[in-house]
Amino acid sequence: MKEAATFPEKRLDAYPEKNFAENEEGYRKKKWNRRKITIVLLIVATGFLTAVCIGGFFCKEAAQVTDFSRKNLPPCLSYPFGTDWLGRDMFARTVRGLSISIIIGVCAATFSAVMAFILGVVSATMGKTADAVVTWFIDLVMGIPHMLLLILICVACGRGLKGVILGVALTHWTSLARLIRGEVLQLKEQIYIKTVKKLGKSNLYIAMKHMVPHLLPQFIVGLVLLFPHAILHESSITFLGFGLSNEQPAIGIILSEAMKYLVTGKWWLALFPGIMLILTVVCFFTMGENLRMLLDPASVHE
């Protein structure tokens, strides 16, 4: 009796070209979706920043106008965020306070990112002595409790816009500086960098010509991710009373003043400013993470 003919079982790995094409197509779709999400977030964030800054400029006077005939009004059509104990429009105060926080966040994040970029490049390219000094300084700053160092800098510089910007900027650069330093050390091991160095080019030339262009994606992602942290820490330090003065309606000031009225049922005084602050932080943090996934080669397959 003849045995029935058997055929080899089909396996997915029998057609590697087909599997590779399917995986590549799926990756492209996933990457395109992430790119679209990032572009949409970038447009929304840019429009939000512009609208808040313009609105804060026009709400400068309205945020300080008092009217006791309308004090402690809950949210309504005339006053979407309600009014406070002095009859001030909470919508105008929230927009004005958020614009102040955004301006501080942009200035502090930019200053901190530039400082981290310069120190990271200097540490990795200017010899062992410079590397040891910068690394020691990074470890020193990271060894001090974050909020304590921020409070000390703000108090030393005086309460106000200048002190808060310097305090936030000087306490947020260390992680990005370490990242930049690590990227530069990896680039130094590349063959083309060693070839250029053997041709007699200086460290400054190599850094500016061949390293800086490769570091721009990390710098952009670091800058975007520093922005929500700067806003959050500015609001925290102002909430604790070490930041801006009470004459400036920053989000931290608004939340600090609203705490004593929560027990009386005036929930809107803290709810809407807090929601606006959280939405701003989450929006830019999400955008930064999507940018990192698009621009960072190490996370290309995540």
Locations of regions flagged by a protein language model:
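Transmembrane-helix boundary motif in ABC transporter permease subunits
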Residues: 55-58, 104-138, 151
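Generic hydrophobic transmembrane alpha-helix motif, especially the helices
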Residues: 80, 84, 90, 124-125, ...
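C-terminal transmembrane helix and the adjacent membrane-cytosol boundary/short C-terminal tail
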Residues: 171, 217, 224-225, 267-302
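Transmembrane alpha-helices
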Residues: 99-115, 204-236, 284
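Transmembrane alpha-helical segments of polytopic membrane transport and secretion proteins
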Residues: 1-46, 286-302
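Glycine-rich helix-loop "coupling/hinge" segments at transmembrane-helix boundaries
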Residues: 155-156, 183-184, 225, 232-276
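Amphipathic cytosolic juxtamembrane alpha-helices at the membrane-cytosol interface
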Residues: 88-103, 127-135, 185-189, 194-221
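Periplasmic/extracellular loop-to-transmembrane helix junction in inner-membrane transport proteins
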Residues: 26-32, 64-108, 253-274
